[in-house]
Amino acid sequence: MFDIQKTEEFDEWLSNLADQKAQAKIVSRIERLGFGNPGDVKPVGAGVSEMRVPHGPGYRVYFKQTGKTVVLLLCGGDKSTQEKDIKRAKEIAAEL
């Protein structure tokens, strides 16, 4: 089991999503991640991974695992902002 922690940037992104069904799907995926079942995830570099949520525009959650039990949710976005979001996630990870 993992301790899931969130950055303020991630919390703000998630709470500002207009699509409540998308919010619920993302929260569900985060809960699964907490139980060690990340699903559709791929590394994007600098220790950051991208969790893909197949809903709407293709939501993405960027996270970094620290140690064996802590996962930090860095930021989120969708397929249309993927390159910018990956760059931002790496910046946040470097600041931690």
Give each language-model segment a name.
Residues 2-31:
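Solvent-exposed, charged helical/coil patches
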